[in-house]
């Protein structure tokens, strides 16, 4: 999606390039649901029982997300040093930049998603309280949808904010995080049902996805995407098919955050190759640019995560840097 939006030479117009690919930007909403579900798997019971301290909980969150993001911020600042990029880089490095009233950060622009998710991490103990039981969880989901709607149509006007409220805002994104938490509360029953009726579950997901594109959804604000992405996660919980359960999917999921954060850097690298000099078909040029961007991002993410960071961690453990 980002490649298509930034390409000077656009691919031909069709249902794929005009409707489907632009919708890929909403996958960040799916990742919010998955983030909430995975956080609940790891910390929901531990937070409720007090089995983990705040220091350990937040240290783990920084340890997981900060190193690679910080490296990308440093690279971006080095490429374009200025007072503006310094201020934005500083905000990025705190991981708290979504607490700003109108965060419009261009240094690692795609990092807005990480900022929103990290705000969710900050609120996770409160989130655990809100989802203390299934009944309360449904009530919270309903209230979050109402609050999201009010935020968009009332508080999202120029009288209150500089720009409309969107995915960057935690109130807008809250229903997706809550949905992930509710799916966690029902995980055992969902897993059992999908395992027994996987064809019905898969067909339901496909129908919902198709309806998302063929039905007029204006006026339904976030509900269509919420239903589609929640359905796919519920299917994934009990799915045993090769599409979602294979070595490639498992490998890519391990570096998905890194790929997301660095892919625009490799789009710029791909642009420097001037592939348009060798490929004169616009559609093929788009495919080639996507492939070079994706391959570069995957290779870079793999090397940094599994080699560079491991070597640095090993060196620090041995005290080579006096730590």
Give each language-model segment a name.
Residues 21-34, 41-80, 84-96, 120, ...:
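Transmembrane alpha-helical segments and their boundary/interface "anchor" motifs
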Residues 16-28, 103-116, 154-179, 209-232, ...:
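Interfacial loop-to-helix transition and helix-capping segments at the boundaries
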Residues 1-4, 78, 96-100, 143-156, ...:
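Aromatic-anchored segments of alpha-helical transmembrane domains
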């Amino acid at each position: 999606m980002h490649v298509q939006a930034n390409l000077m030479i656009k691919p031909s117009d069709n249902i794929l390039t005009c409707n489907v690919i632009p919708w890929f930007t909403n996958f960040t909403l799916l990742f919010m649901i998955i983030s909430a579900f995975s956080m609940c798997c790891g910390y929901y019971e531990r937070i409720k029982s007090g089995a983990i301290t705040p220091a350990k909980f937040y240290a783990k969150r920084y340890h997981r997300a900060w190193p690679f993001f910080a490296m990308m911020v440093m690279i971006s600042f080095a490429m374009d040093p200025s007072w503006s990029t310094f201020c934005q880089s500083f905000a990025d490095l705190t991981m708290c930049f979504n607490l700003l009233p109108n965060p419009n950060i261009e240094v690692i622009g795609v990092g807005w998603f990480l900022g929103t998710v990290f705000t969710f991490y900050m609120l996770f103990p409160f989130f655990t309280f809100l989802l203390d039981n299934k009944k309360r969880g449904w009530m919270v989901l309903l209230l979050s949808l109402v609050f999201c709607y009010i935020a968009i149509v009332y508080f999202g006007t120029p009288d209150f904010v500089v720009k409309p409220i969107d995915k960057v805002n935690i109130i807008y994104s809250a229903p997706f995080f809550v949905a992930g938490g509710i799916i966690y509360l029902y995980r055992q029953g969902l897993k059992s049902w999908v395992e027994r009726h996987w064809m019905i579950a898969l067909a339901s997901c496909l129908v919902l996805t198709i309806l998302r594109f063929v039905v007029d959804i204006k006026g339904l604000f976030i509900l269509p995407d919420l239903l589609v992405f929640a359905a796919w996660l519920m299917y994934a919980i009990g799915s045993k098919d090769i599409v979602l359960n294979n070595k490639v999917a498992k490998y890519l999921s391990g570096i998905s955050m890194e790929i997301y954060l660095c892919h625009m850097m490799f789009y710029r690298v791909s642009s420097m190759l001037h592939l348009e000099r060798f490929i004169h078909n616009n559609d093929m040029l788009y495919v080639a640019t996507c492939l070079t961007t994706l391959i570069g991002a995957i290779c870079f993410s793999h090397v940094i995560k599994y080699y560079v960071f491991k070597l640095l961690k090993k060196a620090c453990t041995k005290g080579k840097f006096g730590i």
